Amino acid sequence: MEKDLDYTMKFEGIPEDRMSVGDTIDFVYKALVEKGYNPINQIIGYLLSGDSSYITSHKNARAIIKKFERDEILEEVITHYLNRK
């Protein structure tokens, strides 16, 4: 069967409305790295200040992280850290 070379496949990834807090942190981290930012510093800046301009709009990361409250994100980070030990 011959493939239609004029057709472009599109991979959607994880739908934004189904992302967990952990998935969101990973997604935003990767978007920040792709844009050349220090992701740890940028995420800390956002969590401390609430200023979403610390998060890139690349890949819609800024809008995605704002779907969660900052305390939910901190809870996920701390829980993940404590469960590693």
Curated annotation (Swiss-Prot):
InterPro entries: IreB. It comes from the Bacteria. Pfam families: IreB. Coiled coil: none annotated. Belongs to the UPF0297 family. This is UPF0297 protein CD630_12830. It comes from Clostridioides difficile (strain 630).
